[in-house]
Structures are given as C-alpha cells and as structure tokens.
Amino acid sequence: SIMGMGRGAGNLNTELFVEYLNETAGADYSTEPILCSIDNTIAPIYMTTAWGYSLSGYLSAKYRCHQNYARFLNNKNTLTFEGMNAIFSKIEPEKRDNYDREYIDKLYTAHMSAGGEKTPEADLSRLFEGRNVVIIAPGRTTSVESERQKVFDKVKATDAIVISVNHCPEWIKCDYVFVSNIRRYEKLSGIETDKLIITSNINAQAGYTVGYEPLLCSIEAVRDNVTLMLIALLIRSGASSVYLAGVDGYSFKERNFAYRDMETYEDEQVAKEQNSGISAAIAQLSQRIPVSFITKSLLEREENRS
C-alpha cells in the first residue's frame, strides 16, 4: 500500500516497489503522483495515527543519505515533498554517509532563502511604526471563547493592528496575514492579496514579500518559528509593542492547534527544545520591544503576563 499504510509497522510500500522496478527491471513508472498523494492525503492521517516509516525516510533511502538528514528536515514541518526532495538532491556524495547538522542546515536555509523581489523596509515601517500589534497564532487556546474575549478586549484597549500567522482565523478580523510556511500557505484561501505578508521562500503573489534569512532566530531549535520571525520583522519596522495570542507552546501528549489538520507528531524531546527555545527567544526579543501574552501558554513567564 502507499506509504505502507496499515496497522503497526504497516505494509510493504508501493513507492519502494516502483522505485526498485525502475532501477532494476527497466520500468519507467512515475513516482511523483504517489509521493504527492502521500504528502497531501495520507501523511496528515499518519500524524494522528503513526505507522511504519516516513516520507522523509523514503527520500533518505532513495538518495542513500544518513537517516538523521531526513529527521532534521522532517522536524522542520515547513517543507513540501518537492522542497525536501530538492534539498536531498543537493547533498554532495561525500556528505551522505555521515550526518553533518551544520551542512544540512545551510542547505535548508539556502533553499528557504531563495525568492524574488523584496518589499522595501520603508513600506513596512509605514504600516507598523509606532503601532501596537496583536499576533494571532493557531494555538488551541484560540478555540476557547473566554480566551478569545481576552483578545478582543486587548485589541480594543490598545487600538492594535491584528496579524495572524500561518492561518486565517474566522473568529476575528485580521488586518494582515503573515505566512512563512509553504505548506500552510497552500491551505489558505480567500485572503486579499494586499493583506498578505509572505517570506521569500514562498513564490506567490502577495502585498508584501520580506526576506526569509534576516528574520531567523539565533536559537537553533526555533530558528524559523513563524511568531518569532514576525516579531523580528515588527522590531525592524518600528512597532511599539507586541501581544501574543494562541502561542501556546508544544505538548507531545495533547493537541497543539486549533485546527486538526495542522497537527503534527511531536517527539517529547523536540517539543521540550522548541518550548525552551521559544521562551528564551521571546526573552531576548523583549529587550528590544515589549512582548506579553494574552492567552494561556506553556511559555508564559510571570513578567510577560498581559
């Protein structure tokens, strides 16, 4: 079956048989439709009921690379099959057998940094300079009515601009939507182009396109966390203060998102590293701009309560 879907360890994999026949029996099967089906349909099911191995593991085997390369890219949760395949194809033969974290991170960053023309920073400063900003992340707390009311109250009290990240909530009107994840972007619909702010790794029409690499965090585990990237952009654009909603932190036992189709399998160690990384990054960013939480969060520190 495709992706070996089945109970426990799953079944033998269609895509592996196809690749084997192409290499050894002179067959000319196209694997791309199968892999796209995995990416778009079967992989989301796998995230809630895991079995067998992963798509990234298949690519690691295909390119005969150390499995930790696959794990590194998979844990990013930002790449489509096409993007991951493109990165694997650039791994040099002499680098494939032994895992080099710094090397794969450079390939990943180079892939994500590629893009077209960027919006002048002056244009963004005109939007945000001197303004309070409420950031709406897709954390599970934003599905709770009492938590939503806190957000409404904060927006009204501070006359804040509202920016959602990697999603477009229906329960509140957002002035802008900031997207850094191509997988999330592909699931969005009905957003006015002039309200869309994207990072340069996304090749799409938008009101504003900002450089990906300049917004990266210095903490490895959360280098390209979307909320941290947006805060960095707001600092560069002269915003006055930032309030966070739906930035809940990560749990490896419970749901993390307001939307089930956003759920990913969270390894306990990865979740801990992300939580500590985001907390540390917010503490650093708070030295340059006031940052506080509106909704409940595992990341919340006493001094950052709103």
Language model segments and positions:
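Metal-ion/cofactor- or nucleotide/acyl-coenzyme-handling active-site neighborhoods
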Residues: 115-306
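Catalytic cores and adjacent flexible loops of soluble metabolic enzymes
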Residues: 1-120
